[in-house]
């Protein structure tokens, strides 16, 4: 059994949030020990077929800067200027995310990011133990047992407090639930996802535009591709669980090939291993997790996906989890006892987590159904015009969430007002030539206060 040190925290999960928090706290003098169920990815390779590629936004970059990790991470990232929309008929069209190349997002492969953060966490002084699956927790005695699944051997520790950064299927959350119910609810989409890959050209380089997030929207389903720094694309098909087409009717590589030939014909030649990868990679579930509370006084706390997992359609799950890490480190600085710090952290983050969960669900409908809709495209044009005229007041939803660090709850509230303005102003119009700009100015100034950070 290991003795407990002063100002020590024990973390469950050495994924992205766990490693970033370990860096932040180790550099502030905390003694951090991390226990990870899987093996060391630097030795055994990364678990395949489970992770959607990650979109790094300003929130995530800010957190990396606080941890001194931004330079290392950005060397592995690829810029994405916007959505490259591939219609079933016609040429792809780029829909920019922002006004110029200062307003972009960055694609990074989960494995590369995890390895970089693991290295930095250990360099900062954190101790990371692999092949340690959380089995039993006695929160009153401060005792935990882990199992090494390679040989079924138990490993026992004493702890001061546990931080759960072990993802949507959190073992710590399950242990907390057994101690005191957390009010856990998970709502799964009736869609799942399958991850595939576009390889680089034989001589290296991307087979399609490398600085974009590619989308093939097809109504009830869609296919996306995010670039990696080695010239590959991580590609993901989102498909209903039932109906036609669906995972129920696309059961093997041959049926997947037929689906792509019919609905994604320009993508099919890009994925030479489609049949093989389809059968090797299991479908992933998509769900939204909510809890009534995230902590047990000062004994345990959940962060990131363990507390508020979301669907991936706004590219904010990692960015939100990284914000959690900075917020928790700040609350630990501000409070003398863990119970107060954990309560303050939850109070500060709960509304924002709920807001981005809602916006992620809404963004799925936009990506799947609306990116090639004429009404939506006209509203996008007006949105850009309103931002150009009144940039501190009419700040596009995507800008607030992705390029600024506007609180998610504020971004949600303002986005709902702005959506109403766009819908009302474009109703009955096929272009912007006949809009009443004076009336729009009055509406914008009456309904939208200047936003901090907008320019």
UniProtKB/Swiss-Prot annotation:
Family statement drawn from the similarity comment of this UniProt entry: Belongs to the aromatic-ring hydroxylase family. KMO subfamily.
Example GO BP: L-tryptophan catabolic process
Gene name as annotated: kmo
Function, in words: Catalyzes the hydroxylation of L-kynurenine (L-Kyn) to form 3-hydroxy-L-kynurenine (L-3OHKyn). Required for synthesis of quinolinic acid.
UniProt cofactor(s): FAD
Catalytic reactions on record: L-kynurenine + NADPH + O2 + H(+) = 3-hydroxy-L-kynurenine + NADP(+) + H2O
Enzyme Commission number(s): 1.14.13.9
Molecular function as annotated in GO: FAD binding; kynurenine 3-monooxygenase activity
Pathway entry: Cofactor biosynthesis; NAD(+) biosynthesis; quinolinate from L-kynurenine: step 1/3
InterPro entries in UniProt: FAD-bd, FAD/NAD-bd_sf, Kynurenine_monooxygenase
Name of protein: Kynurenine 3-monooxygenase
Alphabetic keyword roster: FAD, Flavoprotein, Monooxygenase, NADP, Oxidoreductase, Pyridine nucleotide biosynthesis
PANTHER family named among the record's database cross-references: KYNURENINE 3-MONOOXYGENASE
Signal peptide: none
